[in-house]
């Protein structure tokens, strides 16, 4: 006998929806970050326009960065000091907007293989310490936000720019929502870059 509610999703009673950050606040914080241009603020700028998880960004090395490519991008892959959360987390992320500007500044200042030397070395990433420091700083400008809010906003901004859900999932490394999306190689870098520039 068919179950009429078998396909109905019910959110957990105690589930808390994390707040996104408004576009206006994102732009304001990005400007502050690029003006200050220190390690922590450049990290915030990088996350704000790539949608990366904090741990993903902290674990980057310069070999992951392709600034001189026709479509500048990050090749996000697993490393011994920073594994990725899921298989779908391995992805190409175009560098646009504040993220691109932040990486250019860091590239001129680079002194080691890691982008964020204060928090990452060959033994691992100190994400907890970094998260606490960034959240404390961010609340001065956006009281209800935390660093992970940029990831939620990334999805909202892409959706509002008319980017199809399958591409949004690929850009953010979110799990595919259908069996069909698991076939093929996904969207190419040009398509990803063009779509990501829609919200800049």
For each predicted feature, which ranges?
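Short, polar N-cap/turn motifs at the start of nucleic acid-interacting alpha helices
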Residues: 1, 65-71, 144, 163-184
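Basic, Lys/Arg- and aromatic-enriched nucleic-acid-binding interface segment
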Residues: 2-60, 151
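Conserved tyrosine-mediated DNA breakage-rejoining catalytic core shared by Y-recombinases
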Residues: 9, 59-102
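Catalytic-site neighborhood detector that most strongly recognizes the C-terminal catalytic loop/helix
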Residues: 12-15, 20, 121-122, 161, ...
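Active-site/catalytic core of tyrosine-dependent DNA strand-transfer enzymes
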Residues: 26, 79, 96-143, 154
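Hydrophobic (often cysteine-bearing) scaffold residues that line and stabilize catalytic clefts
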Residues: 39-40, 126, 130, 134, ...
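Exposed loop/turn and edge beta-strand positions of beta-sandwich/beta-sheet ligand-binding modules
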Residues: 40, 70, 89, 110, ...
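C-terminal catalytic core of tyrosine-transesterase DNA break-rejoin enzymes
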Residues: 45, 49, 56, 149-175, ...
